[in-house]
């Protein structure tokens, strides 16, 4: 899941200055979905993330009765779509999905910490981590009710 660089043949033909400029341009032109490694990488991250949440005593109570395979599938869809991938999120709105759960701001923050732990484990670069949080962060207003 590390940032991929252009082909070796192209890299060898470029000067260090041009290579630096070209790589920066290529990185900004690729979607976050591509830079995260695509669908299979997102599935792996979601699997680990859900395991982190299940082990997190601060928030695992919110997921105790969850249909875990369905939860994982919806998270993959959500991240895939939100990062520019080909998926379409088919789940309920965040407001509807979290209605009556009494999620507090610190609960949401714990979830974000668990995601960060997973992203660090998979060596996702900080830039992509920040972009992913920027995609998911606005959902907080629909999830946090207390």
Segments from the language model and where they lie:
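Bacterial N-terminal signal peptides that target proteins for export
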Residues: 1-11
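Core of compact, soluble alpha-helical bundle domains
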Residues: 24-146
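Alpha-helical transmembrane segments and their juxtamembrane interfaces
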Residues: 12-14, 66
């Amino acid at each position: 899941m590390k940032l991929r660089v252009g082909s070796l043949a192209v890299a060898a033909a470029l000067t260090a200055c041009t290579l630096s400029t070209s790589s920066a341009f290529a990185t900004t032109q690729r979607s976050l979905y591509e830079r995260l490694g695509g669908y299979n990488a997102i599935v792996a991250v979601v699997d680990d993330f859900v395991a982190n949440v299940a082990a997190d005593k601060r928030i695992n109570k919110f997921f105790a009765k969850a249909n875990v395979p369905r939860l994982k599938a919806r998270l993959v869809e959500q991240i895939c779509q939100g990062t520019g991938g080909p998926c379409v999120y088919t789940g309920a709105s965040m407001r509807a999905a979290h209605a009556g759960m009494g999620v507090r701001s610190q609960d949401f923050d714990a979830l974000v910490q668990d995601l960060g732990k997973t992203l660090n484990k998979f060596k996702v670069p900080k830039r992509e981590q920040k972009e992913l949080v920027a995609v998911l962060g606005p959902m907080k207003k629909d999830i946090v009710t207390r």
